[in-house]
Regions:
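Gly/Gly-Pro- and Ser/Thr-rich, intrinsically disordered tail segments characteristic of DNA damage-repair
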Residues: 4-119
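Phosphate/anion-contacting hairpin/loop surfaces
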Residues: 70-72, 76-172, 176-177
Length: 177
């Protein structure tokens, strides 16, 4: 079982868990496990089925959103919302499943249903997600962030508001307040 009310560090833990669980495996199916997900994400799941079998190449996260490359220009993405988690057990509020050719099953459970799944283009990924602002995954250009902080502190903003700017500090959440 993985973390409730996930912020950036917890999302990174989830990605590490998925990468360990699915390493060297071939994804054989993506499927819904609940009627709400069938209704809300039926088209996403239908599209994902076009990419199987899929050699698992590893999830990565940018801030609180996680991604799996499914072809040269497309990514499967998920967001945990407030209560989302992945585990090897199907539970009451399980909505989505990834299965591998060796019968490994990983379930997405989200009691409050604030999480989501999507297919994102490479262009959308590059436009909407700022990779360099993710301290958990990339070499952080410290000088660039120091300059940003100094420039914004001059405007007399609260430090917390500056740190919550997801463009520069991906995955930092309200736990700072």
């Amino acid at each position: 079982n993985i973390i409730k009310m996930p912020e950036g560090p917890e999302v990174k833990i989830v990605v590490d868990y998925l990468n360990k669980s699915l390493k060297n495996k071939k994804i054989s199916s993506f499927s819904h496990c609940s009627k709400p997900y069938k209704i809300k994400y039926g088209e996403v799941i239908k599209s994902l089925k076009e990419y199987v079998p899929l050699d698992f190449t590893g999830f990565f996260c940018i801030g609180k959103t996680s991604f799996l490359k499914i072809d040269k220009r497309k990514y499967f993405s998920f967001h945990l919302g407030m209560t989302g988690k992945w585990s090897e057990k199907k539970e009451k509020h399980t909505h989505f499943k990834i299965e591998t050719s060796d019968n490994t099953k990983i379930y997405f459970t989200d009691p409050r249903r604030f999480g989501n799944i999507k297919i994102v283009s490479k262009d959308q990924l590059d436009k909407d997600y700022y990779k360099e602002g993710d301290f958990l995954n990339y070499n952080t250009p410290i000088k660039k962030y120091a300059e940003y902080l100094v420039n914004n502190l001059k405007s007399e903003q609260e430090v917390c508001k500056i740190l919550l700017n997801q463009k520069y500090f991906s995955g930092v959440g309200n736990y700072l307040k």
